[in-house]
Amino acid sequence: MQRIMKIAFFRREINPEIGALVAGYSMTDHSVMIEDDLFMTGLLCDDGENKILLISFDLQALDEWFIKQYRSSCGEILGIPASSVMFTCTHNHSGPQTICEPRYEHLLHRSYMDDLGKKILEETEKLTGKLQDADCFFYSSNVDENLNRRYVTPDNHASFLPSYNEMRPLCDGFADKELGCLFFMDPVKKLPLYIIGNYAAHPLAGHAPGLGGLKISADFPGAFRNYITAQTGAECMFVSGAAGDMIPKEDELGSDAARQMGIRLAKAALRSHIAATRNKDRYCMQNVKVGGLSKKFTVPLRKKYLDDQSNLPDFYQGSPDITLEIQCISIGDVCFVGLPGEPCAELGQEIKWHSPFRRTFIAFASTAYIDYVVPGNFLVSGGYEPRSHHFSARNSINFVKAAVDATYDLRESVYPSEGEPYPDYIDHPLVWKPGQQ
């Protein structure tokens, strides 16, 4: 029997007050104006048996305690496990202080967090009455809007590109260019209902020196959503990928840079939409099932954190190890992998390469905030990101392995194999042509 996907969604403004501390660059910058609104956007998918909820926030990050509390509460409202509720942040650097920074825990905007929690629960309560049928399409394309901010010399020494503008022409580090999209279509009217875009870049395009860093703004993810909605009528979500070392090509250049980058990504998403919907046999997923799963793993802290635990937020102090969570949710043959902190693109790409799903998208700052998560060799080459990598270098590969294991476990639970495990038994032709099964 054909399985009919149902979806419901919300969009809620989450601006702080003018004067609120602006997160991301310093602990002294206070906002002076709102340039464009911050939002949280949520999507509920129901396959008739299981549900998943994905919420994206125009925020820098959220603490683990907050994520766990409100994922659990949302799950109770919807009658689903907390592992089927995923939070992710765009990593916006033009919003309020929403995490407990080491030594600056007192600067957490607690009244804002209380209000945010109420808004999450209010919007989740409304979702079940909004469900409507939807066809689900997927599509990915490469879009050249980001670059790797690490310049690494032939003898493997890294420099932080934003501090050395003259090195930009030399920048050739790995960059994840994938713009991954999901399109939810009205099956009768054949019009788009909801669009998700996934791309890896710090939202820093609009953060110009001076006044540009004191404006409340969603940066390019907001411009992306606005353009999509204005042109299609569909609501829209942006999910940041593994953006730890990814920056916009026009980073820190102001409002126009943010707006134009968002529009260029949105145009690429519309091109993807056209291609996907005009080739339904290839890109429309059939009998879509959804699922969620989380996996925990424990790793030893680096000596710098063991010797001086004031480098850690209060709630991580007192232990030689740190326990982290990897979370996966799937919509058909597309998986979102929710990672803690700021994973670098190289790690995100490894997870994508090893996943058993047709397409895998990374969800940034999803399960906790633990600063940067880097490949082990970054601690050899240096640069900005490894300075705040929390755990032992040799465990970066275990981070990848835990995420990949989670993708396999989730796919097997949603689409159980018969006999030999998927995808081991697949025997593809040497050259695949559209229309082949």
State what each model feature region is.
Residues 241-246:
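Structured soluble/peripheral alpha/beta segments that form catalytic or ligand/cofactor-binding pockets
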Residues 265, 272:
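Anionic-ligand-binding alpha/beta catalytic cores of soluble enzymes and soluble regulatory domains
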Residues 2-88, 95-235, 253-260, 273, ...:
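Conserved beta-alpha junction segments in alpha/beta enzyme cores
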